[in-house]
């Protein structure tokens, strides 16, 4: 291989000056590299620049005309494997051609005839029609159905390009550093110029420098630009519309080497429409994604990359932050500004198979992967210029999974310090990591060599190199640019979400160092206690604030609760740690976070994950960690705040669906909002984020309680809290401000009765409104609260809205609360409404009992009766509803069944008629065949008689006509 690499380098150097006889180069290689390495991939690796790289998945290909064209006999049938599918080939005019129809029916069977045709035209692939003989050969070979009337044949190379444009795998052609194609056109008086692939990063990029006037034109304008030289003839172009430039621009060197012409084809195919759908094809790395439509052959990578050539010359002076795209596996999406390590801009390239050229530091396998600092194309520039948060791409654009598939860009990853090929494609990041991390910035943090390590997309851990401290630091820095991995919303199982590697814990230390400040902020902002929770991330998250947020869903900072991803002020403070993948399987009600019905399922869901995060036992997070609160719900708890299993819900909601305190939503509306949000107060993460005394499980995770404004969807600015006091003296002030703050926060909305702040049952906040006789009750609750999750929050309705006079109802409520407590205790399951609220109706017997005993004394009997009646009515109502639902359902079932039977009958009828028709046809056909046969025989005999009576031996029943 070394030899070959060497060779690759040589070719590279020679390449520009003299297009020397392709044949000995290719022939030579063909013998060695090419065949040995099993395919184009290898070839590119050796021929580097010239060839397209991924061009052919595995081909022995048109090298044949060179190496042994003598071997090819006309109409010789062969079989070629294209993307692993055997395709019949036929030698036509000394060239092996593949059967397009067969390709369409196998590899491209998911695309319509039109799509295939249009793409073929766009790629400039001409189809050669078979002769009838060849068609018959193809039928016999099984490539075409017997009924086929014609078949187009395309060369293997064309077939590969066609399939590649559909099936992905877009690497821009590899071209040497300052390469330019010499092109000419003959429209009007013609002109010649240099097409500079490195500048060709969008369909309208001015990438052709006119040879006469040295001005730059886009390809479609260049064909209308001509210089009238003395000897020029005026040619009226047949179809010079702007987009036909691919037809009119030709390489001036007619005898260009194969690779050159192939590279030219690939470049031409680059922005050639075709696939609008690949606009963000995160395919070619950022490449496809970034180019504004990357399109066509999708050679996206190149495109976005700043042009196939991706020559970094093209980068001449863009601010480093345009971040390099590595030509080949392109950086993961346009990274955010990488100030963290400016050297990265070019450094990355080095890492990712360095600009140093084949031999260069990172130079992998001797191929230059031309990183390019794109001259941004439209879409791309847009993405980069917007402060990301305004532009969140649904799938964390920068890295999202488009990158995953390219895990093994063989060329690149080949020689690299395996930063973990895993990250390989992610912008060579892994590789870069090896290189001391300059590239790391490129990756989405998870992917960074550091914590998330190579595992970012592909499960495997980054190898040692990636874990260097340096790398980790870089990763942390990177993290500033990209949020930590869960780039996407908790899309349930579908994403390739690797389990977070253990590497995190190590990374933790370094990252912490890197982002000490951030971490501090984090502690303050308490985005879920990054430290305790997900070891590796603190730094990342903290630092996230400092850089632009990445436009990815993750960027939802603590505050954009509803996933609205509104523009986040960059300093948002740490993100909640990413959801531990295991949890992902749960069925999410909302796209953004689970509405978990009760604490136990939560424990189940996240238990394991949390352990991974080191946040302690399944339930109470480590009491010590101020922030630790029940691990932040992975899916971005409400504002990264309250701990998941908040203490028992406001119990009173048991009876009627109450409007949610914070956001005035009815329970059902709340589905989307994290259920923990209503309970943030209860977790003691009251807006102050003070922790209630007591159960660790309630410690707010540094929460600053939800701060949604009344309608719960415009995130309010986050309050920074001071480090949570370890324990507030019986939650006095907590409740007090809680209550106060909340009152001011949620204006009663329109018609609903707004249940007002829930102070912890009987915390002094509540005490303010109770009659003194409640005091002892209060104490008891304090105790209860201290006991465990059941710090039930009693919502005293309107207590603090002086304008509502029925404060007395506090008692009723209380009572409800109590009651529902007892209910719950007996049922040990959240009562229906609770479930509705999506709250964990987990109650502790202890508390329940205490409450009940204490309060039954305090409850007047009529109140109990009233309650009972309400409950009964409620139950009746529910039963009625249930009944009606059941009836509806049964009706529906009946209707369905009837419908189904009818369908079955109809199908039967259709089938019978079809069968009859078929029989008829068969008979008719048979009759016609008979007639034809008779006619044929008659003709045959007749001609026999006419021409050569002697051939027709006696068995001819035909009488010679009587002569006149």
UniProtKB/Swiss-Prot annotation:
Single Gene Ontology MF annotation: sequence-specific double-stranded DNA binding
Basic and acidic residues composition bias: residue spans: 798-808
Biased composition (Acidic residues): 652-661
Bias (Gly residues): 283-310, 356-365, 417-440
One Gene Ontology biological process: negative regulation of DNA-templated transcription
Family, per entry: Belongs to the SKI family.
Name of the protein this chain belongs to: SKI family transcriptional corepressor 1
Gene responsible for this protein: Skor1
């Amino acid at each position: 291989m070394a030899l070959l690499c060497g060779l690759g380098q040589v070719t590279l150097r020679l390449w520009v000056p003299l297009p020397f006889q392709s044949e000995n180069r290719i022939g030579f290689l063909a013998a060695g590299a090419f065949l040995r390495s099993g395919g184009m991939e290898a070839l590119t690796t050796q021929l580097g620049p010239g060839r397209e790289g991924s061009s052919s998945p595995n081909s022995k290909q048109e090298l044949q005309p060179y190496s042994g064209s003598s071997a090819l006999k006309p109409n010789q049938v062969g079989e070629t494997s294209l993307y692993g599918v055997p395709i019949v080939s036929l030698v036509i005019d000394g060239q092996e051609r593949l059967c397009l129809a067969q390709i369409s029916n196998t590899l491209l069977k998911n695309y319509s005839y039109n799509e295939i045709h249009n793409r073929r035209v766009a790629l400039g692939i001409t189809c050669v029609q078979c002769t009838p003989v060849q068609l018959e050969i193809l039928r016999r070979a099984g490539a075409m159905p017997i009924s086929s009337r014609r078949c187009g044949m395309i060369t293997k190379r064309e077939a590969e390009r066609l399939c590649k444009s559909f099936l992905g795998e877009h690497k821009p052609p590899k071209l040497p550093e300052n390469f330019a194609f010499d092109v000419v056109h003959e429209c009007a008086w013609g002109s010649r110029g240099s097409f500079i692939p490195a500048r060709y990063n969008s369909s309208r990029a001015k990438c052709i420098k006119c040879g006469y006037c040295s001005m730059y034109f886009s390809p479609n304008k260049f064909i209308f630009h001509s210089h009238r030289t003395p000897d020029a003839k005026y040619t009226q172009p047949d179809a010079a519309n702007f987009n036909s430039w691919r037809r009119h621009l030709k390489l001036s060197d007619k005898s260009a080497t194969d690779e050159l012409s192939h590279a030219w084809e690939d470049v031409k195919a680059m922005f050639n429409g075709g696939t609008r759908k690949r606009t963000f094809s995160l395919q070619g790395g950022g490449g496809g994604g970034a180019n504004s439509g990357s399109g066509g052959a999708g050679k996206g990578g190149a495109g976005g990359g700043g042009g196939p050539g991706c020559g970094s010359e093209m980068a001449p002076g863009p601010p480093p932050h345009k971040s390099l795209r590595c030509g080949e596996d392109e950086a993961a999406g346009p990274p955010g500004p990488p100030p963290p390590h400016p050297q990265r801009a070019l450094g990355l390239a080095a890492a990712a198979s360095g600009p140093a050229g084949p031999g260069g530091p990172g130079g992998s396998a001797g191929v230059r992967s031309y990183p390019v600092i794109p001259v941004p194309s439209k879409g791309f520039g847009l993405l980069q210029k917007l402060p990301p948060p305004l532009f969140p791409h649904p799938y964390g654009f920068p890295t999202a999974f488009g990158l995953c598939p390219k895990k093994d860009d063989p060329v690149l990853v080949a020689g690299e310090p395996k930063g973990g090929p895993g990250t390989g494609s992610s912008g060579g990041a892994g590789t870069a990591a090896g290189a001391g991390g300059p590239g790391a910035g490129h990756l989405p943090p998870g992917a960074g060599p550091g914590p998330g390590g190579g595992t970012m997309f592909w499960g495997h851990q980054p190898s040692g190199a990636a874990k260097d401290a340096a790398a980790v630091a870089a990763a942390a820095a990177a993290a500033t640019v990209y949020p930590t991995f869960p780039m996407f919303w908790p899309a349930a199982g579908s994403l390739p979400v690797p389990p977070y590697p253990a590497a995190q814990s190590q990374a933790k230390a370094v990252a912490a160092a890197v982002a000490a400040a951030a971490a501090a902020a984090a502690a303050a902002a308490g985005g879920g206690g990054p430290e305790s929770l997900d070891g590796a991330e603190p730094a990342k998250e903290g630092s996230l604030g400092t850089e632009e947020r990445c436009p990815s869903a993750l960027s939802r900072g603590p505050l954009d609760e509803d996933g609205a991803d509104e523009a986040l002020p960059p300093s948002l403070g740490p993100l909640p740690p990413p959801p531990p993948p295991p949890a992902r399987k749960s069925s999410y009600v909302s796209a953004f976070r689970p509405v978990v019905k009760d604490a136990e399922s939560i424990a189940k869901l996240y238990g394991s994950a949390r352990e991974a995060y080191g946040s302690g036992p399944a339930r109470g997070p480590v009491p010590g960690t101020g922030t630790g609160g029940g691990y932040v719900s992975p899916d971005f708890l409400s504002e990264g705040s309250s701990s998941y299993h908040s203490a028992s819900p406001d119990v009173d909601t048991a009876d009627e669906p109450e409007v949610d305190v914070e956001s005035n939503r009815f329970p059902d509306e709340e589905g989307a909002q994290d259920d923990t949000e209503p309970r943030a107060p209860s977790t003691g993460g009251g807006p102050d984020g003070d922790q209630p005394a007591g159960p660790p499980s309630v410690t707010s995770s540094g929460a600053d309680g939800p701060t949604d404004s009344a309608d719960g969807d415009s995130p309010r600015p986050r309050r920074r809290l001071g480090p949570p006091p370890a324990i507030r003296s019986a939650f006095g002030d907590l409740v007090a401000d809680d209550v106060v703050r909340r009152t001011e926060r949620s204006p009663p909305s329109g018609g609903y009765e707004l249940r007002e702040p829930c102070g912890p049952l009987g915390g002094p906040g509540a005490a303010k409104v109770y009659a003194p006789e409640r005091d002892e009750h209060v104490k008891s609750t304090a105790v209860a609260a201290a006991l465990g999750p059941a710090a039930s929050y009693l919502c005293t309705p309107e207590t603090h809205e002086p304008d509502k006079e029925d404060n007395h109802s506090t008692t009723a409520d209380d009572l409800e609360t109590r009651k529902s407590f007892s209910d719950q205790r007996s049922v040990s399951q959240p009562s229906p409404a609770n479930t509705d609220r999506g709250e964990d109706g987990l109650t502790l017997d202890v508390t329940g009992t205490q409450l009940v005993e204490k309060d039954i004394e305090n409850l007047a009997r009529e109140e109990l009766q009233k309650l009972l009646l309400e409950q009964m009515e409620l139950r009746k109502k529910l039963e009625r509803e249930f009944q009606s639902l059941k009836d509806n359902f049964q009706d529906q079932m009946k209707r369905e069944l009837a419908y189904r039977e009818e369908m079955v009958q109809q199908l039967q009828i259709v089938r019978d008629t079809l069968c009859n028709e078929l029989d008829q046809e068969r008979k008719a056909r048979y009759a016609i065949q008979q007639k034809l046969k008779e006619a044929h025989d008659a003709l045959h005999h007749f001609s026999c008689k006419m021409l050569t009576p002697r051939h027709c031996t006696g068995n001819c029943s035909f009488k010679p006509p009587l002569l006149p």
